[in-house]
Amino acid sequence: AWYTHIPGLVVAVPSTPADNKGLLKAAIRADDPVVYMEHKGLWGIEGEVPDEEVLLPFGRARIARTGGDLTLVSWSATVAVCEQAALTLEAKGISAEVIDLRTLWPWDIDTVVTSVEKTGRLIVAHEAVTVGGFGAEIAATIGTECFSSLKTPIIRLGAPRVPISYAPPLEDAIRVSAESITTAAEAAMA
């Protein structure tokens, strides 16, 4: 969230190999400075990457999965976690739309508003600390823009405000998981 406070700075956060190529090429050619935040957890991910020249526009989200009951908004490595949760929710009869922001600034307000107006529910999931995280900006904006469409309060999922451990089990314990997203989604649907 810190970088989003700097006027004129673009903040790119890819979640797939194809987006990594498209956003990086766009960043190289951009007139504005770009902070390119590549999550180390995505380095081993394999996926289709187009051979042709692809420049992804900043500020345009990707709908990773369509759904009608609730909206899950995320970025970077947490998008895959949201997709896992959406599969679990689907088995329970809950249809979740997953939105990958791709850039935190500018961020695609219109895509998120359109989805929340359709579903009436929003969960924002990210790895950063929930307090002061970019999820709070999304929640505030959508709370204002979609107030009359919301069926439940907006839910923010992130890390607790504690030091991050170097021990993998302790690090995993504070990360947003597919299970925590599923639990929050079920509560939102109740």
Task: Specify the residue positions occupied by each region the protein language model found.
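Glycine- and acidic-residue-enriched helix-capping/beta->alpha junction motif
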Residues: 27, 31-33, 138-142
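Conserved thiamine diphosphate
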Residues: 1-30, 189
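Thiamine diphosphate
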Residues: 40-190
